[in-house]
């Protein structure tokens, strides 16, 4: 008799519960997250078992071990799974059983499992973004120190350019001693971060940028040599999205719709989206609007039509949504971006 297995994964251990075709559940089994113990437990399960596990922050190695053991893994969307379980009580065993029941009933809300090599390559782009965020944070701290002690100047437009660095070095002695040391440490850290970011970007240019999908995405307005790899790697297999709108929604560019009693209202964007992909398309939209090239004037026209009525934020999101949906068709049809005959600005959202 076939069994359906639910795995409630935590940082240090997982709880497994099996449910058979009649809905009878096994006793919960707790397995510590020691790789050998985990692998040995998986070997004891029936061959090619169906296992459901939530996409928590540490699922990579757990899924790898399950697939290595020959099992069929189903990655569950945590928020949707909890809604469908509909429980008021929560225990590890109940969560594992709930996943197993959803899997058995064919109602498990599944997420796509990116292949291992793709997950690994994503780390290049995601680490670059993290280092850039850290660099911005350090720059803000230095700017704040300069302002606190009245050392700002209008003669230098970029405090971290060549002239800006020279200016900071010449005024460093005017800070209190400990503040001066901390500013210098942060300046040194910025140089190290810049070197690491450049090293990562060079790796991206060599290992990822030459790919045919990346080259196609570079035809999208505002998408350059870094944004194209981000978009490609975060999308993965575009065929997992049935429609272009599904990709835009996954990227957090489609507002939620609430309808009741004949009234429809648009809500905000869900927080549970791919934030990396959202950032990439919004960044591309901002770049496309800033450049205002004749070839992509239709993008600026869409932005300008929405700007007066909805403001910059919503207008940019609308442009980003257009770019996301265009990227879907570019990857599906394997064609370069072409300006649409007509952009409909009255689309909801």
Give the ranges of each region predicted by the language model.
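Short helix-capping/linker segments at secondary-structure and domain boundaries
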Residues: 106-109, 138-139, 197-200, 236-240, ...
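Glycine/alanine-rich phosphate-binding loops at beta-alpha junctions
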Residues: 1-74, 83
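Short alpha-helix plus adjacent loop in nuclease-associated cores
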Residues: 67, 74-126, 166-169, 261-276
